[in-house]
Structures are given as structure tokens and as C-alpha cells.
Amino acid sequence: FCVENGIGWNDTFEDDTVHDDYRIDYMRANIQSMKDAVDIDGIPLMGYLYWGCVDMVSNGEGEMAKRYGQIYVDADNYGQGTMERKCKDSYYWYQKCIQSNGEDLK
């Protein structure tokens, strides 16, 4: 298994979502590398667990500014906000990737 794989970023909420192409690019590159490891090198990869489906407090920095999830949470570094959740672009990209069993990385 490839586990706890993700990227933290200071996401910006705009147009009622987060346009996180940098997260999509990161995930695409990692998934392609896993596919290559299986197809070219014969590695018996059983699964991939992306780390941080929902934004959470950063373990290293103790703040919300650096976000890891594919779902935005309206909260600041002090726990203030509506706690409303909104799917980021990466959520929809990963949904499509999963539905295709990793074949659609566009």
C-alpha cells in the first residue's frame, strides 16, 4: 500500500470552491508513478490511501492555513468559521480517477 500521501497548501477559496490544480498535478504524478511501478517493475501494489480527504489542523504547525484535504472546511487558525464543507476541484478529479480505476488521469 502507498499510504499517507498528500500535499499541504495555502488554498484560496474563490468562486465557491478551491481551484487546486497543484494538488491534482501532485496526485496525478504520484498515481502515474504507482502505475509505472506495477506495470514496468512488477511491484505488487494493493492500494493507495490519499492523506487528508477533509481539511484538518496541520499536525506540524497547528493551524488551518496549510490545507491538505480535497474538501475545504470553512475554519481559520482559531477554530472560527461556519465549518461548512465544499468540494475542491481535486475532489472531483479524484472521483473521476477512482471511477476509472486509475486509467483516467486527465
Language model: regions and residue ranges:
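Non-catalytic scaffold segments within catalytic domains of secreted glycoside hydrolases
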Residues: 1-106
